[in-house]
């Protein structure tokens, strides 16, 4: 006669197996996310999702895992740190001639690594419970990952809308819920270059640099171009300014180590990449999905924001006529360069960026 399943023991084993597979934290939650539905609907109604139509298309199913995968009783949420050693946050940000890539994208595409580990975790569980089914998701299904992570006890949602942990800050990929500990702090809201955090816990994606440089397929609105600075793929500012990230832990995963070609590279060199070279360098990287055209679009904006230099102007002019979308950003960037040359302008860093660099150098010296 088979013994009844000890769910408490199984939960402990799942967390142990997850740790053995390289996850820093493993939590288990139920599927009831109904409390998040009104906020999700209000966010969609305000069009804060921009061009990310899939968010509206799936509607409230994002808050109903049991409808997405009928029969689902529990969701396992995991945390994996991705902060690399020698992240060079400040060094890259304060040199406008270098390209800043969000630190999660410097190494191997996290989707693949995490999905493989989650699959192994699911298979381990099936060895103990053959009748159970599982499906691993890593940004691949329309579910609300952050509310699940909260319910699973991985942390709380900060005012920048990311999950925070007392022990690890927010530089990680997503039992009993954890109390919110942001208090009166609004550092992430005030540091955002484009004012994308429109109210606590609410991000207007249409203003977010990560959205503008990664998700947006068309032209970057002119009002945001000067504010993007040298950020050519994503932005980490709201995380870098967060006091909790003083406790962020370095990753143990070699796959998340920065690729040399993407770590603080000169903008002029990046802008010269052919599509074939772009595809070669970004193979297995999250960056590849935006394609060569949007990559060049982002770099053109950064070159426009860089100090006057004849080399910047020549680089921009060399790619005229390749594509209408790129031309729009090249012409804007050339105009910015000529304006600086004609005014003999001295490069002035934006106050928010200067403040951020000081905070990183003081509070995160190992990553500066």
Where are these regions (language model features)?
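Iron-sulfur cluster-binding cysteine motifs and their immediate structural context
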Residues: 23, 187-211, 217, 231-255
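Alpha-helix N-cap/helix-start positions at coil->helix boundaries
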Residues: 289-294, 323-328
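Alpha-helical adaptor scaffolds
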Residues: 260-293, 300
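Short microdomains enriched in Cys/His and/or Lys/Arg
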Residues: 185, 209-223, 257-272
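Structural detector for internal amphipathic alpha-helices that build alpha-solenoid repeat scaffolds
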Residues: 296-307, 328-337
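Loop-centered beta-sheet repeat module
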Residues: 159-160, 164-205
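Amphipathic alpha-helical scaffolding segments comprising HEAT/armadillo-like alpha-solenoid repeats
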Residues: 277-281, 308-320, 340-350
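Auxiliary alpha/beta "docking" domains used to position bulky ligands
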Residues: 1-179, 345-368
